[in-house]
Amino acid sequence: MDTVLMATTPPIRCLHASIPTVFRSPAIYQVSCRSSQLFSYRSTTMMSMCFLRRSDLRSRFLSTPKTTSPMRRPRFSVGASTEESSIPSNRNLIVANSVVIVALAVANRVLYKLALVPMKQYPFFMAQLTTFGYVLIYFTILYTRRRLGIVTNEMMDVPKWRFAIIGFLEALGVATGMAAAAMLPGPVIPILNQTYLVWQLLFALLILGRRFLLNQIAGCLLVAVGVVVAVSSGSGADTTLSGIGFLWPAVLVASAAFQAGASIIKEFVFNDAAKRLEGKSLDIFVVNSFGSGFQALFVFLLLPFLSNLKGIPFASLPSYLKDGAGCFFNTGAKISGCDGAPILPLLYISTNLAFNISLLHLVKISSAIVSSLTMMLSVPLAVYIMSKPLPYLPGGSSLSSNFTMGCIVLVLGLLLYNIPTTPTKQHTKTS
């Protein structure tokens, strides 16, 4: 749920979600199977015994009653294999969704760049339009699906305070990210943003109780390194953090942590709802609607701070938004330089909506980490496309050899993450 900050990576959605070749089918089968089994009552309670006994983070989200069956203390190891699931694999669906998401993510980044051609003076207006406009769209869809019986009363009864946490973390991530991006040189921002995947691994361990193989951890790190090398291949790639200090890089890393935490909590909501709904899956528009609604609420409370970060005095914000609306609809004789509106902005918004819905669906059927890896594949593809002459962007640019090297490292990381493994006898017994 996130698209306000386009300083480093194009918007995933305005403030909603700010993230990831298609995965090989054996790998996807492995990921999808593990996520379903890991959320059983037994695995959740077992992991809670061996990790963070004093302040169990997962117990703050779990509200289902504990089982009374005897519990065994598991042996925790980062290199241990996750339990295999007996649920049939939906890897074909994950592959199809991954392909769609890569295509939509590339289109999303390119169209955002094109949308800023007429809206180059009003990027903050675009951010607020998507933030608050998406709330109206999502709740309209949710209301329609509720009337059609697709969304049930049980789905609407899921705890709403979890969505409040999601919205708060995403809004806080946007605010801190904007503050840090204003103080940091451009080339270092995508590098620091790759800590997002590292935070996801950590929060999946703490909140979901998930265990990762060493090849999965190494694969995620390789993907992050590949993105850094590919994105930082431009003329300003030699810019370093020297002379910047520790504060603002730390703030940007914290911003990635907030958004990564929100993505993992979304995954937790889907898995916990499957137990509450007796095997039925939670409709994604319940999560999108309430998550976006709470995010918009917190963004509204932070508007004075956010507008000042963009150099817009809060007292001048109404007139700025009015001029932005005029440029968006390309009306008014006083507004110039808005050629391409409203077609280009509307193309971006419609693509961004489809992208956000598809991305959340991938989180639902696989995991937040799989969605992030899919997203990261789109980064070099989008950079390559935007280096070519485009309508309204005829210039184009050349890419260095580092770009190719970064893409190779990224693909190797994806392959390493998805290496199929054979469960040992011990792991089979614990399933």
Swiss-Prot record:
Q: Which InterPro entries match?
A: CRT-like
Q: Which Pfam families is this protein grouped with? A: CRT-like (PF08627)
Deletion phenotype, per the entry, is: No visible phenotype. Clt1, clt3 and clt3 triple mutants are more sensitive to Cd(2+), have a decreased level of cytosolic GSH, an altered systemic acquired resistance response and are more sensitive to Phytophthora infection. Clt1, clt3 and clt3 triple mutants have decreased lateral root densities.
**Membrane-crossing residue ranges in chain numbering:** 99-119, 122-142, 163-183, 188-208, 212-232, 244-264, 284-304, 343-363, 365-385, 403-423
Membrane topology designation: Multi-pass membrane protein
A GO CC term assigned to this protein in UniProt: plastid
What are the GO BP annotations of this UniProt entry?
A: defense response to oomycetes; glutathione transport; response to cadmium ion
For this entry, the transit peptide stretch runs 1-79
Question: What SUPFAM superfamilies does the database record attribute to this sequence?
Answer: Multidrug resistance efflux transporter EmrE (SSF103481)
Q: Which UniProt keywords apply?
A: Chloroplast, Membrane, Plastid, Transit peptide, Transmembrane, Transmembrane helix, Transport
Similarity comment: Belongs to the CRT-like transporter family.
The name on file for this protein is Protein CLT2, chloroplastic
Q: Which organism is it from?
A: Arabidopsis thaliana (Mouse-ear cress)
Q: What is the lineage of its organism?
A: Eukaryota, Viridiplantae, Streptophyta, Embryophyta, Tracheophyta
